[in-house]
Amino acid sequence: MRGGLAVILCALVSAPLSLSGQGVNLRTRQWNDPYVAIGNKAASDYTPAAALLSPYYSYSSAAASFDLREERNGAYVPEEGDALRQGRFDAWSLLRLKGNSAVSGRVGYRRAVKRDVILNETADYRLLRPYVLIDTVGGDLQHEQYSFRGAWMRRSDRLVCSVYGSYKAVHEYRSFDPRPRNVSSDIKADFSLGYLFPHGSVIGYAGYRKYHQRQDVSFMNNTGANTTLFHYTGLGNDYFRFRSTGVFAATRYAGQGLEAGVVGTGVSGRLHYGLSYDLLEVSRHLSNQNEAPLSTLGTETLNSFASYRVSPSFAMEAAIEYERRRGDENVIDCAASGIYNSILSLRMYTQDMVNASLSGVVRVEKRYGTWHLVPSVRWMLSSEEYLYPSSWMEFSTLSGRLAGGFSTIKGLWLCDLRAGVEYSGCLYGSHSLQSGEELFRVSCIDRFERRTTGSLQCNAQALVQREIRGLLAVFSRLSLGGMFYGQGSRMLTLTVSIGISY
């Protein structure tokens, strides 16, 4: 699969630059237009076959970027550190070919340092939480990531189909005690088939996912500070029997998943809709203890969206996501036969999360440029529970956002400016935690307080691009962001990018 993706992506980079009669600045403005994105972007994220039916022109872009994140008064997500220094390269493309077909692809590379990561020794934290390996020392983590994905799409009369594949690899490590070294891989593949009606379309798709991570932790000095490692199980609890200073640190994650969904259009393309279901089961093993099976995390995700273009200047989109995490922990025997066996499995951890949003886009076109106004509202609910010792945490937030932008083309120059502000408040929140480790309980309470404290977020972005002979353009982009919450806590972000588009 990786070789096939490489062929597709090389073709994207070396493809002719004159596939579209539109200038690069015009195509860039179309791809950045939030009005055009309503419905089309969400449908294309579900399956690449939807991109073939979208109004997007052929377009390619490659950029080198530097990301900076700084936080004060602790990290909003301590497991990912309170600061980030990251260099990255991203290239992506959608190329419409002859014969009603198209190819798309994306490549990415990231090299980063996560500062002061605590209570997490495992890569892909957001995917595997809460079943990660943690320690009470923490420190900087080196992060390296490669990603590739490609798709082929074709339309034949009233039928449309696509084939898609992706691969992501992550390497994380620390150069002082405790010294985790994590290598993970995530592979996806799917196929879609759809039918076009006189005034709409419907596309169904299905896919397979395979995940793997190998984790090893070593020490140069086993008699230093607190170097105990904990197999975390959620809401302040851990697998007490397998606490260690390295004996039970080698861990292997193995997962498989399925996905299926449907997207469609109606009312001559003014209506878009989609529904998808994802399932991923990841088991965790002690790889240096006869592959003793510790736990299994099952994550189910249900997504849906609907959008409608009321007029050429106004569109709306509603989306909802439901995620359920369920953790089964195994009771392991004493290995009298030399092999650890699971004698009982218990459902110990559950979390239900709901995210619902409603947004609109108002577009006003003038001779000198185009204005956009994008208001939105979002509701979020989270409910976690641990069976024994009985613990639970739940909260709900409501946020409103107002964003706007202006873009204009003057001669060979394109300028795109955007800004937004968002306020989030807590509707309700409560918790009851019991834990043998005070540090774990305090960290859970701290996370709860950060999520339930009102926050103010703001961001601004400026893009300047110069076209060269109508076939190629060079651009620079500056993005600034900030989040302010609690008693003086804040997160500031900066991204600087330079690149080409064609």
Each language-model region and where it sits:
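Long, internal scaffold/assembly segments composed of regular secondary structure
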Residues: 237-375
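Transmembrane beta-strands of outer-membrane beta-barrel pores
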Residues: 66-72, 109-113, 154-158, 167-171, ...
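Residues that define the transmembrane beta-barrel architecture of outer-membrane proteins
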Residues: 83-89, 142-148, 181-189, 254-260, ...
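N-terminal, post-signal peptide beta-strand-biased segments of exported outer-membrane/organellar beta-barrel
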Residues: 19-115
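Outer-membrane beta-barrel "beta-signal"
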Residues: 24-27, 197, 490-502
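Residues on the lipid-exposed face of transmembrane beta-strands in outer-membrane beta-barrel proteins
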Residues: 89-95, 148-154, 189-195, 260-266, ...
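Outer-envelope beta-barrel architecture signal
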Residues: 56-62, 99-105, 157-161, 198-202, ...
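Outer-membrane beta-barrel translocator domains and adjoining extracellular loop/strand segments
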Residues: 72-79, 116-122, 173-181, 215-221, ...
